[in-house]
Curated annotation (Swiss-Prot):
Protein name, per record: Leucine-rich repeat and IQ domain-containing protein 4
LRR repeat intervals: 22-44, 59-83, 84-106, 108-129, 130-152, 153-176, 177-200, 202-223, 224-246, 248-269, 270-293, 295-315, 317-337, 338-361, 362-384, 385-407, 410-433, 434-457, 459-479, 480-502, 504-525, 527-549
Disordered: annotated span: 569-596
InterPro entries to which the protein is assigned, alphabetical: IQ_motif_EF-hand-BS, Leu-rich_rpt, Leu-rich_rpt_typical-subtyp, LRR_dom_sf, LRR_R13L4/SHOC2-like, LRRC69/RLP
SUPFAM superfamilies: L domain-like
Record-annotated IQ domain positions: 540-569
Highest taxon above the source species: Eukaryota
Gene name of this polypeptide: Lrriq4
Pfam families: IQ (PF00612), LRR_1 (PF00560), LRR_14 (PF23598), LRR_8 (PF13855)
Biased composition (Basic residues): 569-587
Keywords annotated in UniProt: Leucine-rich repeat, Repeat
Organism (species): Mus musculus (Mouse)
Length: 596
């Protein structure tokens, strides 16, 4: 599911891992993750990276996996084509303009990745790879007429043609590739699918995102093995009732279309676990959808619901729920039945009172309430003992809500106020959030920070941009894990003298501050220049202190009175004080008689 946001906002990266991203949400796909891990293990276990062209002795007849990606290759090296036992070949992200005839030697190759190269034509010999199961030609400016070669690859199970400029799919591909299970066609210019697509009876996944479909391709509804359909970012106005025939469908992505309603028959897709309806024009859901009891992820953001659909509260298996920008004013009492929720996005709504129903969701780990009208938090928020990320940016909080300090698992807090009320202080009790790693408190009216920040050992990111800070507490130098300190647009004129002790600090921003120490020209040179300036300052100060102590000792030993008296006398223009014998002390060395 895709959500965007400006500024610091609390949103989800991948569902089950439950980590935050800014500003985009991505799907969590355990299958893809497993494939990635498997690929990496193979890479580590069997062969160093391919080229290896410089060390050809490392390539042997028994080599079956090779990675030549990101090498700047313009052709496929003959050394690779000579490896007849190769099963998996990665040549993506190069500058390869043509496939040589020798490609036909790779008769045992099952996986061939050539995406993001400069291929236009495909040589006929490519069609001779009789063992090939997975082919990726994405991101190449392919000539459509050359794709007929692909139809000869009868063993193909996965074919990816993303971003290849396709305006149509060659019918030969759909007629001949009867074993195809995954068909990737996203980011092209397709308006329809050939009717021969019905021959793909083994197809499990089809990706058609970012094309020009105005009508749902109904032929998909007879492909009964389909588990994943991705039609995000098209121009669909409706979904046919025949969608109910896809009883094995598990993931259905139709975000960013022009849908106004859903068919009742969608309820027959009883295995559906992910339903993304984000950014459509849906006002209500058919009551029959309450039968979709296996749903774990639902996206309704960007629709004008105004109320939480009653049936939604029956989806008790939900882990992730996106209700961003849906014109909500509150939640139903039955919302507390969603006890398995881990992520809840209620941002950009019209919520004035924190929904207490949320406090019953004890498994909740991420809560986004950004850009609402919430004024205070209830004490019962302490029941959210597993909450790790809380987004409250852009609300009408009258003061920093101390109820937050009861959230013992909190790791990231977003409470910047780019709109709504501004906070004037950050309580010393912030130290109670011992697990806090990131604190975003930008766009407020803070004039100072609490010294207790130095007692937060896990703090890594502190965003205080656009406040009224005049100085930083010296204690901040003890937050040894701090990686980012964002201070631009404040009233700072100096930095703590030991700030360079923050050895993990990689990002320090000081723009739009009236800096004097270090001066602006030093600040503009970056961290190293700032650290050097602070160290030199300490050395100068230490030397001045040493000289002062030495001179004070001399004055006292010579009997000229205390150092302070001497300073006072000089400031008033008087003569130096007399020594103990009543004689006036000389300006230079003391007389021998005065020596003790």
């Amino acid at each position: 599911m895709h959500h965007s946001s400006s500024g610091s906002r609390c949103v989800l990266q991948n569902g089950l891992e439950l980590t935050v991203i800014l500003p985009r949400l991505h799907r969590f796909d355990i299958i893809d993750t497993f494939k990635t891990l498997t690929k990496e293990l193979l890479r580590q276990e069997h062969l160093p990276k391919v080229l290896q062209k410089k060390e050809p002795h490392q390539l042997t007849d028994r080599t079956f996996f090779i990675d030549g990606s990101n090498q700047g290759l313009k052709t496929i090296p003959s050394e690779i084509l000579a490896l007849k036992e190769l099963e998996e070949v990665h040549l993506e992200n190069n500058q390869i303009a043509e496939i040589p005839q020798g490609i036909q030697q790779l008769q045992n190759t099952k996986v061939l990745y050539l995406h993001n190269n400069s291929l236009q034509d495909l040589c006929p010999e490519l069609g001779a790879l009789s063992s090939l199961e997975s082919l990726d030609l994405s991101g190449n400016p392919l000539v459509i007429s050359s794709l007929h070669v692909v139809s000869r690859l009868r063993t193909l199970r996965e074919l990816r043609l993303y971003r290849t400029g396709l305006t149509e799919i060659p019918t030969g591909i759909c007629k001949s590739l009867h074993h195809l299970e995954l068909f990737g066609l996203s980011e092209n210019f397709l308006e329809s699918l050939p009717e021969e697509i019905v021959n793909q009876t083994k197809l499990r996944e089809i990706y058609l995102k970012q094309n020009h479909f105005e009508v749902f391709p109904c032929d998909l509804c007879v492909l009964y093995n389909l588990e994943v359909i991705d039609l995000d970012e098209n121009k669909l106005k409706s979904i046919p009732g025949d969608i109910g025939h896809l009883v094995r469908l598990q993931k259905f992505y139709v975000a960013s279309n022009h849908l106004m309603s859903l068919p009742e028959s969608l309820s027959q897709c009883s295995k559906l676990s992910v339903l993304d309806l984000t950014h459509n024009s849906i006002h209500s859901l058919p009551s029959s959808l309450e039968l979709l009891t296996e749903l774990t992820e639902v996206g309704l953001s960007g629709n004008r619901l105004e109320k939480v659909p009653r049936l939604l509260c029956s989806w008790v298996s939900l882990h992730l729920l996106y209700l961003r920008n849906t014109s909500l004013h509150g939640l139903r009492d039955s919302f507390k039945r969603l006890i398995n929720l881990r992520f809840l996005d209620l941002s950009q709504n019209h919520i004035e009172h924190f929904p207490v129903q949320i406090c019953a969701l004890k498994n909740l780990e991420i809560l986004a309430l950004d850009d609402n009208k919430v004024r205070q938090l209830p004490p019962s928020i302490s029941l959210l003992s597993n909450l790790k990320i809380l987004g409250l940016t852009g609300n009408d909080l009258l003061s920093f809500p101390e109820e937050i300090f009861s959230l013992i698992s909190l790791e990231k807090l977003y409470i910047g106020q780019d709109q709504g009320s501004k906070l004037s202080s950050l309580p010393e009790n912030i130290k109670r959030l011992m697990n806090l790693k990131e604190l975003y408190i930008e766009n407020n009216r803070l004039e100072q920070l609490p010294a207790s920040l130095g007692l937060m050992p896990n703090l890594e990111v502190l965003d205080c941009r656009h406040n009224l800070l005049k100085q930083l507490p010296d204690a901040i130098c003890r937050t040894r894990n701090l990686r980012e300190l964002l201070l631009e647009d404040n009233l700072l004129c100096c930095l703590p003298e030991n700030l360079d002790h923050l050895v993990n600090l990689k990002v320090l921003t000081l723009m739009n501050n009236p800096m004097v120490d270090p001066p602006i020209y030093v600040c503009n040179q970056g961290n190293e220049a700032i650290w050097k300036h602070l160290k030199e300052n300490r050395i100068r100060k230490m030397m001045a202190t040493t000289i002062q102590a030495w001179w004070r000792g001399i004055m006292v030993r010579k009997g000229y009175g205390s150092y302070e008296e001497l300073l006072k006398a000089r400031k008033k223009g008087k003569s130096p004080p007399k020594d103990k014998k009543g004689k006036k002390a000389a300006k230079g060395k003391p007389e021998k008689g005065n020596k003790k």
